[in-house]
Swiss-Prot record:
Keyword Ribonucleoprotein: no
Pathway membership: Porphyrin-containing compound metabolism; chlorophyll biosynthesis (light-independent)
GO cellular component, one term: chloroplast
Family of this protein: Belongs to the ChlB/BchB/BchZ family.
Cofactor: [4Fe-4S] cluster
Positions with a binding annotation for [4Fe-4S] cluster: 36
Keywords per UniProt: 4Fe-4S, ATP-binding, Chlorophyll biosynthesis, Chloroplast, Iron, Iron-sulfur, Metal-binding, Nucleotide-binding, Oxidoreductase, Photosynthesis, Plastid
A molecular function GO annotation: 4 iron, 4 sulfur cluster binding
Catalytic activity of the protein: chlorophyllide a + oxidized 2[4Fe-4S]-[ferredoxin] + 2 ADP + 2 phosphate = protochlorophyllide a + reduced 2[4Fe-4S]-[ferredoxin] + 2 ATP + 2 H2O
Encoding gene, per UniProt annotation: chlB
Organism (species): Adiantum capillus-veneris (Maidenhair fern)
Active site: 299
Protein name: Light-independent protochlorophyllide reductase subunit B
Amino acid sequence: MKLAYWMYAGPAHIGTLRVASSFRNVHAIMHAPLGDDYFNVMRSMLERERDFTPVTASVVDRHVLARGSRDKVVSNISRKGEEQRPDLIVLTPTCTSSILQEDLQNFVDRASLYSESDVILADVNHYRVNELQASDKTLEQIVRYYLDRARKEGIFNRSLTDVPSANIIGILTLGFHNQHDCRELKRLLGELGVSINQIIPEGEFLNNLKDLPRAWFNIVPYREIGLMAASFLEKEYGMPYISTTPIGISNTADFVMQVEKLMNFWATVLLGKKFHYDQYVENQTKFVSQAAWFSKSIDCQNLAGKEAVVFGDATHAASITKILSGEMGIRVSCSGTYCKHDAGWFNEQVQGLCDEVIITEDHTEVGDTIARIEPSAIFGTQMERHIGKRIDIPCGVISSPVHIQNFPLGYRPFMGYEGTNQISDLIYNSFNLGMEDHLLDVFGGHDTKGISTKSLSTGGKSIDWTPEAESELKRIPGFVRGKVKKNTEVFARQNNILKITVDVMYAAKERRSIESLA
């Protein structure tokens, strides 16, 4: 176990609660001490929903430690069953309460005798999996539970829908632009002639899960959640699924072609016709998406030779790397993800598209990599935005974890052809425009930022700048000022210099010139 003040993926119980609170009329009981019950506040703040978060904390306090938890947990489950009348109550411990090693399945079995609601214990190992893995497992557990029961009760309908249809698996609360992506995905599928059978877990009733196998195929937009449920449906009911994420021109085209392939598997038999989407892809790429022609414009060509670092969850980091390298001609110096459990897939996706790959959950390692590379822009999470501010490198946020700024009220999808426009804007606006900085530096204006003397590393001694050195640094054009400042501070640390003067600046410049000629 490692102590950290920042985690890219939260603890396992957060993943379970995200899934439970995404379904309609499902309540979650969290067996946890005070301090682990922040999910309600976090979801209420970020999602800005009118409804209360359907999560209750069964608090582990000194009385519980003295007498045991069973009576309290069973009482809370029964009480919530009477008050809320949910279809399902999900009981989950947290990492902290798991230390007590209580038989929570026994609590669930006992509570089921008194509650009219279904009661299950989240089948998650809280010591071995993180938020993303737990959400994937919990969704699969709920889908399996209700499909198995429907089959036993004889209310199971396996017949396919009359028109082509798909299930979208993995849209849930607190996801990165999930609601916007879902709207865009529904629009894209509608234009392809595919109706939506079900979207799970977001906004779906559990009673409808028995109709999941009626769809022609499943779609898993994000690898982080939905793959286990889709694999279960494929294994048990022969339902194929698409796991290609339609982010970017090339990925969206691949996605549409996979939809065509799965549609025609049944369409020739049930409808007596075939679907062809080649012309649709061409029209969307040329006339609907602005990203294709923008990537050939002089504005985008100005980004040629710029370096970028990408870091985030596996789905978004891989997709953005493909867009930067393959579609916009930007050099990706480093691409990485914190999804260590999906490292194999990620390496395969970004192979040949970046100079190096980093797979880590340690934000300090990511920060040191960024400081070493000194890219023109960063594309990452909320933490990479903090890192960028400290070393004066702009950052575009492309992945969870994020704060409230990245739960926009306006329509901001990342998926589909409209998503390509949004991503192109994000990428272009994330880079500092050299001439703009230079003109502001010459003529003045709103750019009144002081010179930051903070270093990324918190372990070394701080380096001070003399007023004369700061004045000299301000005379350097803005688009290279950050790099000059960084190189000077590196030179000072290497030579144990704690105060940077004008002479030190020129000495650092001379050293840099010699190294570049060597």
